[in-house]
Structure formats: structure tokens, C-alpha cells
């Protein structure tokens, strides 16, 4: 990470709307950078699948190694999907955030899912304390890394827009620079959240064709990410082609992309 990358990441959030796609490895990160995207974000799901694991089973060490590899591979700002900080206790979250900012990232997100099916969201007071601890760790690092607070209600089967607003506003007050509620797909809800967290920026996950960049920007969204969707589309192509091969059909081998040409010679 350079100071320039952190400054650029903050600048991107100040006005307008930008798309921040989610690569799942170094190759996809470099390809996206060369396509002109101005910032990238990691995806815990995409990384887990690459490692042969389901989403939600990454270890802290796996995540940190991945962050360091992606951040070192590109010049654009990288936002880290740090899931729930790989801890529940706020002080442990702070310690893990300190390690994460040392990998070279320009931003990171902390979510409030509990992974307890009976109580899928952490209590609000605890969630706020975790965001505040992450904020303190970033401030003490002197890096200026941008902090995103995530409200996971719509992900974990608690699609309550009022509770989502309450949580995002509390995370903003606790020091989050950007706010994010994944799986929001109602444009009315998007407008509600934009207004609720203003003047701070809102990240919108677009993992289905429910809006466009122009429409989201018109609603006041500042940042668009796609989560694990790019990785899913890669898996879709892989599985379809693998099944065709299993059936003795090699026609999908036509018109393949020049990946070497896209990525260039890393020795050059």
C-alpha cells in the first residue's frame, strides 16, 4: 500500500459513483486493473472456493496472505473483505485489523453476522464496539485505511430495513467511513439507505441484474461492488465446459481469450 493508494481510495468515495469489482486471485486482479477499474475489492467467497472450501470457512492467516498477494500485485486501491474480523471480541478484531492494514490494503470492511442460526446478527452494542475497535486500530496505525461497516440482516434472513438503517447509522457514528448492507435489491431500500447514512457513502452490492451503474448513481450510491459474482461466473463457465468435455464435446475450445496478452510478461 502507498499513501497515494489510500488517498485515491478516499477521493473515489467523495463524489460520483465508481465500480469496484472483486477479483479472487492475483491473475483476475491484474486483469481487472488492466481493464481500467480504479479500485478492487477482495471476496472471501471467491478466495474460499479457490482453496476448495465453502464460503465462511477461511482462516485469518489465509485471508491475510491473500490480501498481501492482491495488494502487491496491483497499483490501484484494494479493499479487503475481512468478514467479521475473524473474531467476536472487539479487542481481537482490533488486533486483526492491525495485521490487515499491514498487508498493503487501502480499505477494509467488518460485518455483523454471528454465524449462529438462532441469533444470526451480533447484538447491536457489540457490533458497534467492534466497529469502534476497528476504527481505533486504523487510527493508531496511521495508515488512513478506509473503514466500511456492514449490516448483514438481508444476508442472514433478517430483511428488516428499519433495523438495517439503525445499524448502519450506529456504525457511521462509531467511525465507519462507508456503509454497506449486502443483498439489498429494492431501489426504494437503496434510496432509504443512501439518505440514512448521508453524507457518508453507501456501497451497493450488485449480484443480480436489478439496476445499472447509471441508475444507482442517480440514487446517490457512491460505490458498487459485485461480491463473489465474478468468481461465480468463472465457475459457471468452468463447470459447463468441463461437462462438455465429459460428454466428448470440445467445441467450447474455440475463440479462447489471449490471457498471456492481457496479463503481459511479469518479468518485463
Q: Which residues does each predicted region cover?
A:
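Extended, intrinsically disordered, low-complexity segments
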Residues: 9, 228-268
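Alpha/beta enzyme core
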Residues: 2-80, 84-226, 233-239
Amino acid at each position: 500500500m502507498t499513501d497515494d493508494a489510500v488517498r485515491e481510495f478516499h477521493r473515489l468515495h467523495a463524489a460520483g459513483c465508481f465500480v469496484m469489482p472483486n477479483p479472487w486471485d492475483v491473475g483476475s486482479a491484474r486483469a481487472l486493473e488492466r481493464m481500467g477499474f480504479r479500485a478492487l475489492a477482495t471476496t472471501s467467497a471467491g478466495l474460499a472456493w479457490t482453496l476448495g472450501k465453502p464460503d465462511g470457512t477461511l482462516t485469518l492467516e489465509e485471508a491475510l496472505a491473500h490480501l498481501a498477494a492482491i495488494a502487491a500485485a496491483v497499483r490501484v486501491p484494494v479493499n479487503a473483505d475481512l468478514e467479521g474480523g475473524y473474531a467476536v471480541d472487539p479487542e481481537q478484531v482490533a488486533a486483526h485489523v492491525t495485521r490487515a492494514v499491514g498487508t498493503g490494503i487501502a480499505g477494509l470492511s467488518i460485518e455483523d453476522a454471528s454465524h449462529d442460526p438462532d441469533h444470526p446478527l451480533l447484538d447491536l452494542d457489540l457490533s458497534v464496539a467492534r466497529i469502534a475497535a476497528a476504527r481505533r486500530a486504523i487510527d493508531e496505525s496511521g495508515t488512513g485505511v478506509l473503514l466500511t461497516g456492514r449490516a448483514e440482516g438481508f444476508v442472514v434472513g433478517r430483511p428488516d430495513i428499519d433495523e438495517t438503517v439503525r445499524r448502519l447509522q450506529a456504525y457511521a457514528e462509531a467511525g465507519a467511513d462507508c456503509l454497506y448492507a449486502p443483498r439489498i435489491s429494492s431501489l426504494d431500500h437503496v434510496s432509504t439507505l443512501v439518505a440514512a447514512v448521508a453524507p457518508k457513502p453507501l456501497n451497493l452490492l450488485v449480484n443480480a441484474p436489478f439496476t445499472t451503474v447509471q441508475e444507482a448513481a442517480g440514487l446517490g450510491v457512491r460505490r458498487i461492488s459485485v461480491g463473489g459474482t465474478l468468481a461465480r461466473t468463472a465457475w459457471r463457465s468452468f463447470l459447463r465446459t468441463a461437462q462438455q468435455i465429459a460428454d466428448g464435446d470440445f467445441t467450447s475450445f474455440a475463440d479462447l481469450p489471449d490471457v498471456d496478452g492481457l496479463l503481459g510478461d511479469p518479468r518485463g
